């Protein structure tokens, strides 16, 4: 009986440890995404953005992976600052839901913007790590 109890306790502790590791990895990926958008790091973005991403903005505009990279390179969409005010992460198997409140400053087609947003992101765990599959923001 003691060995069965020990086994269950060990499995529980192991599963909590795995969940904490995944949460930490997703948190790092979310921070890396913000950094890559501001610093225009296409190498990091190529790794973090899933091939099938739908990158939705608060004005209804939705970008593909190629759109994000092209608009960043051309200077059409520039992020000068992305500050996280709160982040909540929920892990479910190979998926993570991230809810964030952010303050964003930048410009689109030469027009400056300053927004407070609520952002919902869906991340998927792939062989290469966590990748952003879907993102939608709304103005606060």
Question: Where are each of the predicted segments found?
Answer:
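Positively charged n-region of N-terminal signal peptides that target proteins for export
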Residues: 1-5
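Bacterial N-terminal signal peptides
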Residues: 6-14
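Short, low-complexity N-terminal intrinsically disordered segments enriched in polar/charged residues
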Residues: 14-51
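Hydrophobic pocket/interface hotspot
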Residues: 33, 45, 53, 68, ...
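A short gly/proline-enriched turn/hairpin at secondary-structure junctions
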Residues: 52-63, 73-78
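Surface-exposed, charged secondary-structure patches
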Residues: 72-111
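Short beta-strand edge/turn micro-motifs at domain boundaries
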Residues: 116-140
């Amino acid at each position: 009986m003691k060995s069965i109890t020990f086994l269950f306790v060990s499995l529980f502790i192991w599963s909590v440890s795995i969940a904490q590791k995944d949460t930490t990895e997703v948190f790092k990926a979310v921070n890396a995404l913000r950094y890559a958008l501001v610093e225009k790091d296409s190498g990091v973005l190529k790794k973090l953005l899933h091939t099938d991403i739908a990158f939705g903005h608060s004005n209804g505009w939705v970008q593909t992976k190629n759109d994000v990279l092209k608009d960043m390179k051309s200077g059409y969409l520039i992020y000068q600052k992305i500050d996280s005010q709160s982040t909540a992460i929920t892990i479910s198997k190979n998926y993570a839901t991230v809810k964030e409140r952010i303050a964003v400053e930048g410009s689109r087609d030469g027009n400056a913007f300053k927004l407070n947003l609520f952002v919902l992101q869906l991340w998927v765990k792939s062989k290469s790590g966590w990748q952003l599959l879907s993102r939608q923001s709304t103005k606060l």
